[in-house]
Amino acid sequence: MATQRRDESPSGLSDIVEPDGLLGIGLTSRHIEAFGRKVTSTAGHLMGPITDSSNGGHYHTAMADIHRELRRPTTQRKVFSLTQTTPTDLVRSKLSTSEIQSRALSSLPDELLANIPEDSSSYSLFEGFKATQDDHEFRKAHRRRSSKGKKLLKDGEAAGALPSAPTDLKKERDLLSRRLDLMGVRKNMCSSEIHEIDNKIANLHNMRKIVLDRLAGLEMEEAELEHQLTEIDNKLEDIQEEAPKTPVTAATPKSSAVNDDSFVSEDAAMDASFMSESIYQKLPSHSPRSLKQRSIRKRSMPILHEHFAPGSQIKEMQAHTDMVTAIDFDYPFGTMVSAALDDTVRVWDLNIGRCTGFLEGHNASVRCLQVEDNIVATGSMDASVKLWDLSRARTVTRDNRLNKHEEGEGEDDNASDAFSLFSATTLEDCYVFSLDAHVDEVTALHFRGNTLISGSADKTLRQWDLVKGRCVQTLDVLWAAAQASTLAADTQWRPSGRLPDASADFVGALQCFDAALACGTADGMVRLWDLRSGQVHRSLVGHTGPITCLQFDEVHLVTGSQDRSIRIWDLRMGSIFDAYAYDKPITSMMFDTKRIVAAAGENVVKVYDKADGHHWDCGAGVGADESGPAPATVERVRLKDGYLLEGRKDGTVAAWTC
């Protein structure tokens, strides 16, 4: 039986084939043999000779076409590029563009998903986008419906509008309801953006404050270094000057005595003469000390105040115990000198807000002063003008408590708690000389270079040479006014000046530049003098009250008066360029390149922007609490490079940005 089964299987594979078929899947050797015969037959037809007529012609035609197509260069390049393509690229090339974009947007790496911040919002980003997009589509559809409705009403107003179908109304209602729901999403989006912007602004403000504090510290350190450098330079200059002069001074003491005797005899002769009693010819004796103007080396100017908003307070100091009569400073955050009716003249460091000393020598209150670099000029009610050199200052401790104990009161143990407002020092060695020629109080002064002009209640102006310390010219204001009146009578024209006010200073303000001098007096006239000839070159008529302040530049002259007005004059034409007024008399005024500031009998400083003509207030009175004590009236103002100083009636001095 076994032999018969082997004979039935010609290939002899039946001996190793299991009854269930090859590999247990039902595939027998007979199936494999049949598949092999079919493959052999097909290959024979395809690969057989072309001349064999037994093969089908369509096979040969197909192979010839394929062979011809493969020989083309374009086809060969495509085949070569296909062989260099990775399997991943082959798979991607079978995807459409839309499918690729969908996969790129829908599949994100885990690293990006892990960095998504947590959000407490109840809506998603897609909902917000959809709310914005739907609103745009709604507006377009609303415009289309509105235009169509207008056209129908225009064409058939007589027929009347038919009621819409319920279905259309429901659709409209659903659309409006959906849009109303989306409004909440959009409102939440706007609210979130506002909160985010507020947080960013708060962070920026904090960062700005930190940088401003850093800038303030740098400027304080810079001021200290420059002060130390200036002191060393001054000491070196003094040593170099005294070294060659020491033997000469020691060898000629007798000659000095002779010179001193000659000055004494000359003064005695002048006193014995009639002209010595005249206020026009009285000259002071030569000062033993000469004025040496040492320019302060300023390598960089302070810029801290430029980063504050206009009207911001920088510092406030209780400078005096009575009304401030005069203040001036050299540059922002530099040195300030203040005078008041408490008969003191104080020097301040504006960078730290501390009094560095006193200028003592006047016998009465100081009415006017000017600070230029390290030189200070003060004019007092004792009819004298004194010059001070702050670079020579040497501080000496003194008692300067404001609230001193009365005699008879015992000093308790808490004397250290007494309110001491100032640094208890006095400045010695900074006094240079005194200019004594006026016979009444000095109410105005101005110096530039080696020339100083002073105005007094004795109705004269005096020109001083600061190198020699002598008066070189006296200008009689009354004589000039009389000459103008005589000339006016001859030409049938009379100036419209008024009679001087008894309560006002006869010489209210003055300023000089080279040979030009502008002087404002109590008759409301502004006279322009030529110092070379000693004559009035021009008179500006317009004010109806005493002139209290003035200042000029290359083009304009600005004057303030007790008639409550400030006038801007064009010096080229001699006419009024602009004018404005306040509610009360003007007591002080100054301007820089951008603004004009004035004290007008109120607790604020009046500011006028020259560019746009805008008026605004600056000072402690702006936004002051009405229930509390009101700030004192501003009496004096000074302005340089946007840095404003105000002196009040209660002795307070404050610095502001302007």
Swiss-Prot record:
First and last residues of every WD repeat: 319-360, 361-398, 437-476, 482-539, 542-581, 583-618, 629-658
Compartments where found: Mitochondrion outer membrane
Xref: CDD domains: Mdv1_N (cd22881), WD40 (cd00200)
Keywords recorded for this protein, A-Z: Coiled coil, Membrane, Mitochondrion, Mitochondrion outer membrane, Repeat, WD repeat
Gene this protein is translated from: mdv1
Membrane-crossing residue ranges in chain numbering: none
Family: Belongs to the WD repeat MDV1/CAF4 family.
GO cellular component, one term: transferase complex
Annotated source species: Neosartorya fischeri (strain ATCC 1020 / DSM 3700 / CBS 544.65 / FGSC A1164 / JCM 1740 / NRRL 181 / WB 181) (Aspergillus fischerianus)
Coiled coil (UniProt feature): 209-246
Purpose: Involved in mitochondrial fission. Acts as an adapter protein required to form mitochondrial fission complexes. Formation of these complexes is required to promote constriction and fission of the mitochondrial compartment at a late step in mitochondrial division.
Name the record gives this protein: Mitochondrial division protein 1
Top-level lineage group: Eukaryota
PROSITE patterns linked to this entry: WD_REPEATS_1, WD_REPEATS_2, WD_REPEATS_REGION
Membrane topology annotation: Peripheral membrane protein
Main localization, broad class: mitochondrion
InterPro entries: G-protein_beta_WD-40_rep, WD40/YVTN_repeat-like_dom_sf, WD40_repeat_CS, WD40_repeat_dom_sf, WD40_rpt
Ranges of compositional bias, category Basic residues: 139-151
Region (Disordered): 138-170
